[in-house]
């Protein structure tokens, strides 16, 4: 989900 992508940053 987009939440996971945010954490990757």
Swiss-Prot record:
> Where found, per UniProt?
Secreted
UniProt keyword list:
Amidation, Neuropeptide, Secreted
Residues annotated as transmembrane? none
Q: Which GO terms describe its cellular component?
A: extracellular region
- BP term (GO), one: neuropeptide signaling pathway
Highest taxon of source:
Eukaryota
Q: Which residues carry this modification: Phenylalanine amide?
A: 9
To which protein family does this belong? Belongs to the FARP (FMRFamide related peptide) family.
What is this protein's name? FMRFamide-9
Q: What is the lineage of its organism?
A: Eukaryota, Metazoa, Ecdysozoa, Arthropoda, Hexapoda
């Amino acid at each position: 989900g987009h939440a996971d992508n945010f954490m990757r940053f």
